[in-house]
Design a protein with these regions (language model features):
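Conserved catalytic core of two-metal-ion nucleotidyltransferases
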Residues: 2-36, 79-138, 159-164, 168-245, ...
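Active-site nucleotide-donor binding segment shared across nucleotidyl transfer reactions
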Residues: 30-63, 67, 72-73, 242
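A short secondary-structure junction signal
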Residues: 140-147
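Short amphipathic alpha-helical patches
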Residues: 56-57, 71, 155, 263-268
Length: 269
């Protein structure tokens, strides 16, 4: 057994402890949002898990939620004051070397390592909950966004990935820099159209270009996830079909993979 496979086995062994720690982080976020009138809802695999499994997808090791952009900015301001000791609001401002422009609430007493992580830059690497910004999208055919938006998100991700100096890295900088500029230009042109009926994750962190009708999101409802109830979109069926198609279909065993390559849920032990 090679080192990578050994780490994967350890990650799976610690999966449930990781999930429970993420659930506790989510409960803290939920409390802050309720006290401050901040809207959010379960998204992506977390919402899918709630609908299909009543909680975590058994092999999933992350929690995703979304907030309208204005609510996320408010959350960043209040969370800096209200998060308890041991939790850290990770943004590009609070942790400039973070590998992604995604807001996360991280647990500082754990370690969660993914494939793209590095130990050259000192960003926080604890177990976390992802918080994605939701924005209005132009009232255009959804297929357009599937073509344009991944150009932005994937180019930006590659540009901000850790690179060692090399001719290839130099070439990637110019190639993906040009693609990122082209993607933003196309988004700017699309944004000239009215934005009344569709919303989605902000282009910079929307890897697929998926969007949703506002009517499938609002008014928010609630759904049980593990031992608690959290906000959810109004029409979970339509919302999940936008993301996954036939979302009730269980993937084959070889597709049920955790994201992490190493998980230590408690560094104090």
């Amino acid at each position: 057994m090679d080192d990578k496979e050994l780490l994967r086995k350890l990650a799976k062994k610690n999966l449930r402890a990781c999930q429970l720690k993420q659930l506790e982080i989510l409960k803290v976020i939920d409390g802050i949002c309720k006290r401050n009138g901040i809207q959010y809802w379960l998204d992506s695999g977390t919402l899918l898990g709630a609908v299909r499994h009543g909680g975590f997808i058994p092999w999933d090791d992350d929690i995703d939620i979304v907030m309208p952009l204005g609510d996320l900015r408010r959350f960043e301001r209040v969370a800096a004051k209200e998060l308890p000791d041991g939790l850290f609001l990770q943004t590009t401002k609070t942790d400039p070397s973070a590998k992604e422009p995604i807001v996360k609430v991280r647990d500082l007493q754990s370690l969660y390592i993914e494939g793209g992580d590095n130990f050259v830059t000192p960003y926080k690497k604890g177990i976390y909950v992802d918080i994605f910004p939701f924005v209005a999208y132009p009232d255009l055919a959804p297929g357009l966004f599937h073509k344009v938006i991944p150009i932005i998100s994937k180019s930006n991700s590659i540009l901000h990935h850790f690179h060692r100096y090399s001719l290839r890295a130099f070439a990637e900088f110019f190639w993906f820099g040009a693609k990122l500029c082209a993607g933003w230009l196309m988004w700017g042109l699309l944004s000239l159209y009215p934005k009344k009926n569709r919303m989605g994750t902000a282009p910079l962190v929307n890897g697929t270009g998926n969007t949703h009708r506002r009517s499938s999101i609002f008014p928010l409802t609630t759904i049980r996830f593990e031992d608690s109830v959290f906000p959810a979109p109004a029409d979970t069926d339509a919302y999940l079909r936008d993301l996954f198609g036939d979302y009730m279909q269980i993937p084959p065993a070889d597709k049920r993979q955790v994201h992490a390559v190493y998980i230590n849920p408690d560094l104090s032990r």
